[in-house]
């Protein structure tokens, strides 16, 4: 090679070495990447300053008033590329929680300008959540994804709206169906693979009686980078699910004799299963080999839930039931006794007292848990279960669908994954909701065994006054819940999470707190995700506010992907 060619090659190598990590540092979707690992390749900035505080949900006070101060709303993760931040905003009117369709949703494109995060454009959507008073108690999430140089957001009729990232105009509506049916709903969060192909769920409901009649259809949708799309019946991906009219084991009713089970040999009642459909708030995850992982649930009976692996041509690869996976009920996590919180004496060890069978994982429509693909191609999913103090279970399946292990917490969590030293670690919140309450951030090893925990020990509820000063009152003797549903991890393995005490925390490896910064008190707030930008700024949420936190590190430009 000539000296000039050698120099050009070295320049190219140096450029690629710089650009690729920066591109990987962007946060274009839930969990930052197709596998949802929640990790970026840059170090986050120090938690020195509140650099921005923007209200994106103007109805929080009304939403909290409807539920005695609690906020039962799910929000998207702030999406970040090198050009700016993309966040959902709500408008319209708030009537009642039973009529959340009176609200409107949009995406705002924000950009840093002279140290402030300013509005560039607004892209309105005609998306509406599934009707209230049904499977979801929490207001469902409206969530976008960045791919192919565009932003894609949910639209009406199970469609996807392709938005120009430079000015917010609608490029096209992508409709995988034959016409725009307002009774078909985008179900969950769109996810993009490394090539820019997007996957999301959708299902249809009866217009007059959406929740007492079964679904009219359910699909997994695939959208190619050129905008072509295809919808495959969701039931074809879960061949081991019961037929919609089958009877499926449910739980003992409210009038059943306590403690449960009503007798050691009691058999739980059955109800109609309903058609299998995607979870309302779950995103697909995509493995490095292109396998798509989705979760599904029978429409009338959530105790029949599934994790399915799908090939890139939308044919089924395998489907695993989440039913009867756990043996930690009576006599293990639930003591025998005579109160309603106990198991009846004589019940088989390990059963869930609610149905007298081994415990089952539920794909809850009030949870945002989404599958996470681990570095070896196996997959995690956080389920709901009630008998263990409504803590759920984190489940682990091999890449071939074999149930590997579970951990005694999985409620509303999409774990973050930190690769290090030839292995990986898994980060979750771990709240104990039943007295004595206690709240942890827990890091697990590759076998779901705890490596370390960081316990919430702050007892002070604080508030920021008009002058900016923070004052506190000691009123939470057990600490505060971790109100995070998807942690973020930077290149050093530092974990970023938010708490109901209003602080954003940076927790180092070993469970050592490195920094924290007060945002605003968030008692009773819904769980929210965090993101880290290419320049290391951290984007956190709290009660309808978007906060940007950081120090004074220089911003470095990256390519859009």
Predicted segments with their positions:
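Bacterial N-terminal signal peptides that target proteins for export
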Residues: 1-11
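Intrinsically disordered, low-complexity regions enriched in serine, threonine, proline
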Residues: 5-6, 19, 557
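Noncatalytic, solvent-exposed loop/strand surfaces
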Residues: 23-560
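Bacterial N-terminal signal peptides
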Residues: 9-19
